[in-house]
């Protein structure tokens, strides 16, 4: 199993990264330090997670202590929906860089295709609980992203939560300067995403799988929701390999040639999630896990379902 996938830019992106969505600010600095000490070199961040400053403290300590060199780290962040208007993109990126205490990002993604009304509120809602859109078009947002590459603020740019028609719209943009290097999407055995993954690969776009464990700590979880970590069928596969269910769920996307970014702030779990390079799921077990697809999403962003750029009305 390769430890990296190569982006079309030639950059090597570590196949396993530390996710930081829902990592509490008080715990994420330590999580980042532990992860780097354990060998993680890829950290996945976003402005909307409201913890980039604390992630940055962990990075800064390890860089200043010369535990790791900047060029050996792969740091990803994301442009939030309230900053899609072209004149806001650079400032948003600079805020993230300042918080992370870095002078460049390895990869910067448009977090969602949906633009929201600019302002301090990350989810501006109207009286009916629907998100208030902005006037932006993500193709124009993309042009501002391209400028960040030219200015040296970011090494590569990509998208997240885009369906294949939305990716296609960027690829077909007249005068496109840089195509998306990555599409970061939700992928796990209940949402296997075969069609979208196949489409991205056919265009030379690397796919990052988020919520590989089904994000059991998501704030909107309901008791009746399915649980990947508690699924007896997946537990049985894990037992066969002498591995935990989480390790099988992390290995599964890796063997599909996807990047994967499990989140944890618990040192033991951060270590456990990295112990996935010493076993291989059989083709039969891979197919079995794929067969559990039920098109179940952790992140459906239902408050945006009426937005013109909502990505999940399409099949893929």
From Swiss-Prot:
GO terms for molecular function: aldose reductase (NADPH) activity; all-trans-retinol dehydrogenase (NADP+) activity; allyl-alcohol dehydrogenase activity; glycerol dehydrogenase (NADP+) activity; prostaglandin H2 endoperoxidase reductase activity; retinal dehydrogenase activity. It is found in: Cytoplasm. The keyword NADP applies. PROSITE patterns: ALDOKETO_REDUCTASE_1, ALDOKETO_REDUCTASE_2, ALDOKETO_REDUCTASE_3. One of its GO terms (cellular component) is cytosol. It catalyses: an alditol + NADP(+) = an aldose + NADPH + H(+); all-trans-retinol + NADP(+) = all-trans-retinal + NADPH + H(+); 9-cis-retinol + NADP(+) = 9-cis-retinal + NADPH + H(+); 13-cis-retinol + NADP(+) = 13-cis-retinal + NADPH + H(+). It is an enzyme of class 1 (oxidoreductase). The modification N6-acetyllysine is found at residues 222, 263. The record marks 78 as: Lowers pKa of active site Tyr. Monomer. Catalyzes the NADPH-dependent reduction of a wide variety of carbonyl-containing compounds to their corresponding alcohols. Displays enzymatic activity towards endogenous metabolites such as aromatic and aliphatic aldehydes, ketones, monosacharides, bile acids and xenobiotics substrates. Key enzyme in the polyol pathway, catalyzes reduction of glucose to sorbitol during hyperglycemia. Reduces steroids and their derivatives and prostaglandins. Displays low enzymatic activity toward all-trans-retinal, 9-cis-retinal, and 13-cis-retinal. This is Aldo-keto reductase family 1 member B1. It comes from Sus scrofa (Pig). The lineage of its organism: Eukaryota, Metazoa, Chordata, Craniata, Vertebrata.
């Amino acid at each position: 199993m390769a430890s990296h996938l190569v982006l079309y830019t030639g950059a090597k992106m570590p196949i396993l990264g530390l996710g930081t969505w829902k990592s509490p600010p008080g715990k994420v600095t330590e999580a980042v330090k532990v992860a780097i000490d354990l060998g993680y070199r890829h950290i996945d961040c976003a402005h909307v997670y409201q913890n980039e400053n604390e992630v940055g403290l962990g990075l800064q300590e390890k860089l200043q202590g010369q535990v790791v060199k900047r060029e050996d780290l792969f740091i990803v962040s994301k442009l939030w929906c309230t900053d899609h208007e072209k004149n806001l993109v650079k400032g948003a990126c600079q805020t993230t860089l300042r918080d992370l205490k870095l002078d460049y990002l390895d990869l910067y993604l448009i977090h969602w295709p949906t633009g929201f009304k600019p302002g301090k509120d990350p989810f501006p809602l109207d009286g009916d609980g629907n998100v208030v859109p902005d006037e932006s078009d993500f193709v124009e947002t993309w042009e501002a992203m391209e400028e960040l590459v030219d200015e040296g603020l970011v090494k590569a740019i990509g998208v997240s939560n885009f369906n294949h028609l939305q990716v296609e719209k960027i690829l077909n943009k007249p005068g496109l300067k840089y195509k998306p290097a990555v599409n970061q999407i939700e992928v796990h055995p209940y949402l296997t995403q075969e069609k979208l993954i196949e489409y991205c690969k056919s265009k030379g776009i690397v796919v990052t799988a988020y919520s590989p464990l089904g994000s059991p700590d998501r704030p909107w979880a309901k008791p009746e929701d399915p649980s990947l970590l508690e699924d007896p069928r997946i537990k049985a596969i894990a037992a066969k390999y002498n591995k935990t269910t989480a390790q099988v769920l992390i290995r599964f996307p890796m063997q599909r040639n996807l990047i994967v970014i499990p989140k944890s702030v618990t040192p033991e779990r951060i270590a456990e999630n990295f112990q996935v390079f010493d076993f291989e799921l059989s083709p039969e077990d891979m197919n079995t896990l794929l067969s559990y697809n039920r098109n179940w999403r952790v992140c459906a962003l239902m408050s945006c379902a009426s937005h013109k750029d909502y990505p999940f009305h399409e099949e893929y």
